[in-house]
Amino acid sequence: HVDQKGQLAVSEDEAALRPDAIIVSIMTENNETGNLLPIAEIGALLREHPAVFHTDAVQAYGKIPLEINENSIDLLSISAHKINGPKGIGFLYKRDGLSLPALLHGGEQEEKRRAGTENLAAIMGMAKAASLHTPEAQQAAAEQYQTFADVLMETLAAQGVDVQLNGDPAHKLPHILNLRFPGVSSDLLLMKLDLKGAAISTGSACTAGNVEPSHVLEAMVGKEHPAIRESVRVSFGYGNTLAEIEAFAQLLAETVLATKK
């Protein structure tokens, strides 16, 4: 269960945690809103519980430091493409002493956990991408993404666009913005922007092509809330420039105002 800002209520999670629970799996950062979820609090809750604690850190890896030991994380998964590495490769961190059964049998690869020839080129590409995400690089990127987010929101406000931020402004990363434009169909807005060369979405890449509303927004505001059909997801990457964001912000403002008419 999440609140209207998309945040987990740890007290409710604690109440729902059964003594015989085997694993607890929580995202580090939501991939539609950019919200940072209370991993530290959940990790503290699980210190006295036998359940394995897994976090999907795909969206957050390379953006923020991941305090694995401090947060009592047992398993952590990432994907290389989120740090501009090759697609189709990732890794799973496993705490020392935790036993995992084999995923695929028949070979000695990956400590007998996944049989089959490793994709060495993709592995090396992932390692190279990871090596570039130093603490200094992460900090510089975070500051750049915050500037991009500020420019976008300030431009929309200056143009008189009615816009609302879906999510928790106090606990989120700036490279993902989930924006609601009241009275504007998100599907129509996406189509118009696509024709003008701007790529945004109504959800994550995992749900691309899905005509169903965002399950994330449904959990936040309910299935019948108009925000479900009036919200879009905007994300920034390391290759974006300030000039691109300024141009996109102006284009988005003009398109929203024209669509609302």
Where are these regions (language model features)?
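Pyridoxal 5′-phosphate
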Residues: 1-261
